[in-house]
Amino acid sequence: MPTKLEKVLYTAHVHTTGGREGHSTSNDGLLNISLTPPKAMGGAGTATNPEQLFAAGYSACFMGAIKHVAGIKNVTIPGNAAIDASVDIGPIPQGFGIAAKLVVSLPGLDRAVAQGLIDAAHQVCPYSNATRGNIEVDLSLA
């Protein structure tokens, strides 16, 4: 059973035409991008693709979740904290699926503290909550 939102804080609106070889624009005009399949999938690879957008969204959201739990735990996140995200796409029995990998870099933090932040962030991050039990997600500390 899906978890219902208690309250809507924000709604993103994007209009897409053409699918993987198309164009996406947000209603506020801040997102205005062309899409092409990557070369590895037979495309031109001259523009971004849904997997790159998912990787960007998940990594940005996950860093926000790390900062959120760090604030609760009174831990200062280093200014050079970063996440390297990768999203794989491939066949599954019923069509196609994705898998995500996030490598979190929290330089200067004790490894146990950093891992605790990653684990806690994975419980509150909206992308983690959306993907949990649906796709393979690999989280690691750099």
At which residue positions do the language-model features occur?
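Extended beta-strand/beta-hairpin segments
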Residues: 1-56, 63-142
